[in-house]
């Protein structure tokens, strides 16, 4: 009887533990659902363009199809792959190399969390300076190399925020922090970008901070809380 009781307790404990753990598919948080709209607001608008056959999606910042941030994804990670250099020439861009050539791993594809728990740091990825090289392209083929130094990403949440506009009040969000020019212990990072992510809407807020006297000081922000009609295609003459 005692053995049966202990086995029952173990089974119940495993069941409760399994029930308390879930995973976010970060692709759902970083892309807008395809219902013929894009996000606009007080700053730069954003169109999400999916290219699933090539394992990419684009955060397009203009109806003409560029500039853009290009993210790659697979079953393990989402990578920061390409960003613009010039807002007027899609043949200029920065290509992030990363540890495997796909770019900087900014998030696991699936992030575990405990439903109902208080907001917390869910994940951290550290990237050594040897893996933050990038190409600055002045044309499709001509480029020079540079480096971000030590870098890291953090995923925090889930939060419940009311960001106004067309976004539902008290809606679950995640914060993706991207920090670079850190010291070798991944502290004192000189720059921090924060992306506020909301399922079905994608990146709804962007903030840029710089480290000053040990504190992060906001330099620039962009809120995208209005769902506006209209789609676009990504224009990228230098790759398929």
What is the predicted function of each stretch?
Residues 4-13:
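Sec-dependent N-terminal signal peptides
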């Amino acid at each position: 009887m005692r053995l049966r009781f202990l086995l029952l307790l173990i089974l119940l404990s495993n069941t409760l533990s399994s029930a308390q753990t879930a995973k976010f598919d970060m692709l759902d948080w970083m892309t807008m659902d395809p219902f013929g709209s894009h996000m606009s607001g007080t700053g730069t608008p954003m169109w999400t363009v999916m290219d699933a056959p090539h394992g990419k999606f684009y955060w397009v910042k203009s109806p003409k199809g560029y500039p853009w941030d290009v993210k790659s994804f697979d079953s393990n990670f989402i990578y920061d792959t390409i960003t613009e250099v010039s807002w007027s020439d899609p043949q200029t861009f920065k290509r992030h190399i990363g540890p495997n050539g796909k770019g900087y791993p900014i998030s696991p594809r699936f992030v575990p969390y405990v439903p109902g728990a208080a907001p917390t740091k869910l994940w951290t990825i550290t990237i050594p300076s040897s893996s933050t090289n990038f190409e600055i392209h002045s044309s499709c083929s001509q480029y020079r190399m540079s480096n971000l130094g030590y870098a890291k990403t953090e995923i925090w949440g889930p939060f419940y925020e009311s960001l106004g506009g067309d976004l539902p009040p008290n809606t679950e969000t995640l914060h993706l922090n991207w920090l670079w020019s850190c010291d070798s212990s991944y502290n004192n990072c000189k720059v921090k970008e924060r992306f506020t992510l909301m399922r079905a809407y994608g990146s709804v807020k962007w903030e840029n901070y710089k480290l000053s006297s040990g504190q992060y000081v906001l330099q620039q922000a962009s809120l995208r809380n209005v769902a506006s009609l209209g789609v676009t295609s990504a224009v990228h003459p230098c790759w398929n």
